Each structure stands twice: as structure tokens, then as C-alpha cells.
Amino acid sequence: MLPNTPRRAVYAGSFDPPTLGHLWMIRQAQSMFDELIVAIGINPDKRSTYTVAERQDMLCDITKMFPNVRTDVFENRFLVHYAREVDAGFIVRGIRSASDYEYERSMRHINSDLAPEISTVFLMPPREIAEVSSTMVKGLVGPEGWTETIHRYVPQAVYEKILAEHQHEN
């Protein structure tokens, strides 16, 4: 990295929807780098609950307090190739469990083979949000008391979006 070159990182995921775990990762990563790109990776084989535009809007809402964070979308590319395209020197990944670690460690080696100039940074969220996932949040919607329950796991702007979407069911 050249002197005076901004330290740019990419934090990618499906963010369907963004959770407090994602927000924790964003908060930590933005404090470590000059610029953080929060990128929605489009997986055509994965059925999403929210459109790409909705997910990007939610991410913009929950990251607006961080001037060094921007959102983006990438599709049909390896994350490491996307990182290279946006001149990021780092990929940020979250480790919630031993199985996450094993998977991410393997991916880090593959990424290093494809783009040795890009480093992977692993962050471990605190125990109280380590098990929070978008899939878990979506699974909690519906039963009696779900609105109070999911409020514990998603940022306020995301909570309001989910409530508005399901208001006809209450």
C-alpha cells in the first residue's frame, strides 16, 4: 500500500435483513479503516425476502451516522475480485462460531491465492449477538409476541421496516 493511500475495506453479505450483528461489525470495521464499503452480494441461487433496493435502503439507514461508510452491490463475482475492483486492501469477515472460523479460514486461503495483496480481517462479535443471523430474525416473525422479540436483534430502522411490512398481519 502506498503512503497516503486510504485504507479501504469491504464487508459483504446478503443483509436480508441487516441485524444488530451486522451493525456491530460495521461499527467496528469503520473505526479500523479510512473507508468501509458494505456490499450486498447477490447470490442468484438464494431466495431473498427483501429486494436488493430494500436491503440497500436499510443499510443506508443504519450506517448514515458513519461518514466513512458507503453501500454497494455486486453480483456474479468472487468477493475478492470485487474488493480488487474497488481498490480495497482488506476484506472484513465475522466469526460467530468454530464452523464459521473453519469456513472463513479456507476462504481466506483461496482469496489469498486469487489476490495476495488483499488481506482478510476476522472480527468476533460479543457473545450476546454472536448467534444473531438474518435467517434467525426472519424465523421469529409471525408467532404471538414476535414484534417484541425481533426488536432485540435488529436496528430500529430495520425493525420499523419489518413492522410496516407485516402490519396487516397484526
From Swiss-Prot:
Where it mainly occurs, coarsely classed, is: cytoplasm
Q: Which cofactor does it need?
A: Mg(2+)
Give the top-level enzyme category.
transferase
Residues bound to ATP are 14-15, 22, 94-96, 104, 129-135
Q: Which GO terms describe its biological process?
A: coenzyme A biosynthetic process
- Check the record and name the CDD domains matching this protein: PPAT (cd02163)
Q: Which reaction does it catalyse?
A: (R)-4'-phosphopantetheine + ATP + H(+) = 3'-dephospho-CoA + diphosphate
Q: Which domain of life is it from?
A: Bacteria
Which Pfam families would you find in this protein's record? CTP_transf_like
The places in or outside the cell where this protein is found are:
Cytoplasm
Record bears the keyword Nucleotide-binding: yes
InterPro entries for the chain: Cyt_trans-like (IPR004821), PPAT (IPR001980), Rossmann-like_a/b/a_fold (IPR014729)
Site annotation (Transition state stabilizer): which residues? 22
Pathway it works in: Cofactor biosynthesis; coenzyme A biosynthesis; CoA from (R)-pantothenate: step 4/5
State the GO CC annotations. Answer: cytoplasm
| Protein's job | Reversibly transfers an adenylyl group from ATP to 4'-phosphopantetheine, yielding dephospho-CoA (dPCoA) and pyrophosphate.
Subunit comment: Homohexamer.
Q: Which PANTHER family match?
A: PHOSPHOPANTETHEINE ADENYLYLTRANSFERASE
Q: What is this protein called?
A: Phosphopantetheine adenylyltransferase
Q: What is the lineage of its organism?
A: Bacteria, Pseudomonadati, Pseudomonadota, Betaproteobacteria, Neisseriales
